[in-house]
Structure formats: structure tokens, C-alpha cells
């Protein structure tokens, strides 16, 4: 039986991701696989490649032939060089760098801390301020009461 290591396509239209599988060369692309040995997501930046090195080495040793794309993936991960006994077995796989956690600067905070209230000084200043306001409120009321009386006198 001719065994190949190839890609099995999954995902939506224009959003593919693949599984690296070992299957009979005569089966269809998305058919039944003998074994799944990895994953490949080409749309991520950098591309996500995860291949079980031990299983890939086993299948290559028993005669499984990788397709061109899988051979390129095996070279990136370093499995092909390890199988052939060449230098550079560590591969050139780039890993995604993790983003640093966001830390808001404390000194430039938008929300200002509450200041302690001084109750004694404002309390004294509020009482005199209220007294003239009450007097001013009473004065227009008195004038309003006098105004209708004057109108009544004029109309008689």
C-alpha cells in the first residue's frame, strides 16, 4: 500500500486550516486517514504549525512519502533534516510572540481622587449666604402682593 503524508482540508471558504495526516495515496483528499500527526493554520500570522515529531519520524522511516507542501512544513519544523541526518534539525519555526499585558498609567489617571471635605469652614460661609437669599426671595413676593393691589386701585 502506498502511504502518503498529506494535508486534509477543514474550515470555511477562504478560511482554511489543515490537518497533517497519514493516508493511503488512493483515498480522496478529505477521506479517512490512517493517523493524524499535526495541524497547520496558514491564515494566522505567523502560520501555526504543529507536527508530532515522533510520529512523523516513524512514518517517514516506514516509507511514507510526504507531499510537496508537507515536505516544506517538515523542513520548517526540522523533522525532514532529522530524518535525512542533515544539519539544521532544530528547524526555522517562528512562534507567535505573546503580547504584554496592558497596564494603565496611574499618574495620568482621568478620574481624580476625592479630596477630604472641610465641613467647618464651608458651613459658616453657607449660613450668611442663605440669609440674603431668603430675604431676596421674600422681597419679590411682597412686591407681587402689592402689585395686584395697585392694579385693583387703578381699575376702580
Curated annotation (Swiss-Prot):
GO cellular component labels: cytoplasm; small ribosomal subunit
InterPro entries the UniProt entry points to: Ribosomal_bS16 (IPR000307), Ribosomal_bS16_CS (IPR020592), Ribosomal_bS16_dom_sf (IPR023803)
Pfam families listed in its UniProt record: Ribosomal_S16 (PF00886)
Domain of life: Bacteria
Keywords: Ribonucleoprotein, Ribosomal protein
Keyword Lyase set for record: no
Gene Ontology biological-process entries: translation
Name listed for the protein in its UniProt record: Small ribosomal subunit protein bS16
Gene name of this polypeptide: rpsP
Amino acid at each position: 500500500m502506498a502511504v502518503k503524508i498529506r494535508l486534509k482540508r477543514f474550515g470555511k471558504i477562504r478560511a482554511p486550516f489543515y490537518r497533517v495526516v497519514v493516508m493511503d495515496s488512493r483515498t480522496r483528499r478529505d477521506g479517512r486517514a490512517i493517523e493524524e500527526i499535526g495541524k497547520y493554520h496558514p491564515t494566522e500570522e505567523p502560520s501555526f504549525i504543529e507536527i508530532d515529531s515522533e510520529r512523523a519520524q516513524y512514518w517517514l522511516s516506514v516509507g511514507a512519502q510526504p507531499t510537496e507542501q508537507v515536505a516544506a512544513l517538515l523542513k520548517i519544523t526540522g523533522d525532514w533534516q532529522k530524518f535525512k541526518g542533515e544539519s539544521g534539525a532544530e528547524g526555522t519555526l517562528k512562534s507567535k510572540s505573546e503580547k504584554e499585558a496592558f497596564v494603565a498609567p496611574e499618574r495620568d489617571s482621568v478620574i481624580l481622587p476625592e479630596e477630604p471635605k472641610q465641613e467647618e469652614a464651608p458651613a459658616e460661609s453657607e449660613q450668611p449666604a442663605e440669609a440674603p437669599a431668603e430675604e431676596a426671595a421674600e422681597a419679590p413676593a411682597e412686591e407681587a402682593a402689592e402689585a395686584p393691589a395697585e392694579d385693583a386701585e387703578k381699575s376702580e
